[in-house]
Amino acid sequence: MPKRILNGVVTSDANAQTVTVSVERRFTHPVLKKTIRKSKKYRAHDAENAFKVGDKVRIQECAPMSKTKRWEVIAN
């Protein structure tokens, strides 16, 4: 099974080798026919501490690295 890849924006880089990435998805409500935006935060591994708040990044699924980290940053 291929690993999922998501696009998002770094919202926090306070922890060592970890960034928090906010990923937004858009969908049409089935009844209201209105476009709705929802966002979800993922904690991702950043080995070189290269990414700062506001950077656009791509994250990919990986094996669990800690209790909450299951993603790694692959590009910006």
From Swiss-Prot:
Cystine links in this protein are none
> What does the record give as the function of this protein?
One of the primary rRNA binding proteins, it binds specifically to the 5'-end of 16S ribosomal RNA.
Q: Which family does it belong to?
A: Belongs to the universal ribosomal protein uS17 family.
UniProt KW keywords: Ribonucleoprotein, Ribosomal protein, RNA-binding, rRNA-binding
Q: How does it assemble?
A: Part of the 30S ribosomal subunit.
- What is one Pfam family matched by this protein? Ribosomal_S17
Keyword presence, Mitochondrion = no
GO term, biological process aspect, one: translation
Instruction: Tell me what this protein is called.
Output: Small ribosomal subunit protein uS17
UniProt-listed PANTHER family: 40S RIBOSOMAL PROTEIN S11 FAMILY MEMBER (PTHR10744), SMALL RIBOSOMAL SUBUNIT PROTEIN US17M (PTHR10744:SF1)
Q: Which residues form the signal peptide?
A: none
Keyword Lipid biosynthesis assigned to the entry: answer is: no
Give GO MF terms, alphabetically: rRNA binding; structural constituent of ribosome
Record's GO cellular component, any one? cytosolic small ribosomal subunit
